[in-house]
Amino acid sequence: MKVLWAALLVTFLAGCQAKVEQPVEPETEPELRQQAEWQSGQPWELALGRFWDYLRWVQTLSEQVQEELLSPQVTQELTTLMDETMKELKAYKSELEEQLSPVAEETRARLSKELQAAQARLGADMEDVRSRLVQYRSELQAMLGQSTEELRARLASHLRKLRKRLLRDADDLQKRLAVYQAGAREGAERGVSAIRERLGPLVEQGRVRAATVGSLASQPLQERAQALGERLRARMEEMGSRTRDRLDEVKEQVAEVRAKLEEQAQQISLQAEAFQARLKSWFEPLVEDMQRQWAGLVEKVQAAVGASTAPVPSDNH
């Protein structure tokens, strides 16, 4: 009887162990192909590949993963990988936007909007992975000492779904970036064509000038010297004519200034004479009045002096 119970117990434990340690599902062919493309693609794809590898390691739910999930280390590393991926993606998007400048504004706005939406979906997928692991860590800490088999199975199922969604959105983002890059390449080619069209007439003008210079170089030296002398003579005559015209203008300006000064001097002289006349008209009556008063005063003084010097009659006569 004891032997039978021991056999049953061993069988039960073996079954539990086999059930708990479930083998990780092998990656599907699209996942392997996508990961291979990330390993040899743009910097943002390489960063996403590192996030993908780390998520695959977490999905194994090994003992080391279980221990690190009890601490914030896994979520911190996932956050770092997320930030690195989004940073590289924004840098690549900015680079493509610079190359897309020759494209029509409407097309550029539409492509940018679609790419931004795909970028947001990818960021949301990575954020969901991190949030799910944070939730699992909280639940795992609350169940210390208890069976976590059901919790692990639920996490494994969620991680599989999140990986599939992440793969789908990453593939969609790659396709939209390819369209964006094709538009940038087309815009660059249009820009080159426009530059070529603008430079064409300039090149033709340069060719004509070179031909003209070549024909001038083929002329005899005496003819070229004579033509140069005529041009210099015409230039000197033109400068002399301009100088004479300028001198005439200066003379006219000086004459105008002199006439204005003489006119102003005459006006000042007339104003001074008028002012002098007004002063004279003001003070002449006053002077005449003072003279009359002075003459009257002198007469009164003389009369008073004459009266005081007259002889007094004597009483003896």
UniProtKB/Swiss-Prot annotation:
The keyword Signal applies. APOE exists as multiple glycosylated and sialylated glycoforms within cells and in plasma. The extent of glycosylation and sialylation are tissue and context specific. Glycated in plasma VLDL. The keyword Signal applies. Keywords: Chylomicron, Endosome, Extracellular matrix, Glycoprotein, HDL, Heparin-binding, Lipid transport, Lipid-binding, Oxidation, Phosphoprotein, Repeat, Secreted, Signal, Transport, VLDL. The modification Phosphoserine is found at S147. Residues 1-18 form the signal peptide. Residues 210-290 are annotated as: Lipid-binding and lipoprotein association. Heparin binds at L162, R163, K164, R165, G229, E230, R231, L232, R233, A234, R235, M236. It comes from the Eukaryota. Homotetramer. May interact with ABCA1; functionally associated with ABCA1 in the biogenesis of HDLs. May interact with APP/A4 amyloid-beta peptide; the interaction is extremely stable in vitro but its physiological significance is unclear. May interact with MAPT. May interact with MAP2. In the cerebrospinal fluid, interacts with secreted SORL1. Interacts with PMEL; this allows the loading of PMEL luminal fragment on ILVs to induce fibril nucleation. Belongs to the apolipoprotein A1/A4/E family. APOE is an apolipoprotein, a protein associating with lipid particles, that mainly functions in lipoprotein-mediated lipid transport between organs via the plasma and interstitial fluids. APOE is a core component of plasma lipoproteins and is involved in their production, conversion and clearance. Apolipoproteins are amphipathic molecules that interact both with lipids of the lipoprotein particle core and the aqueous environment of the plasma. This is Apolipoprotein E. It comes from Theropithecus gelada. The gene is APOE.
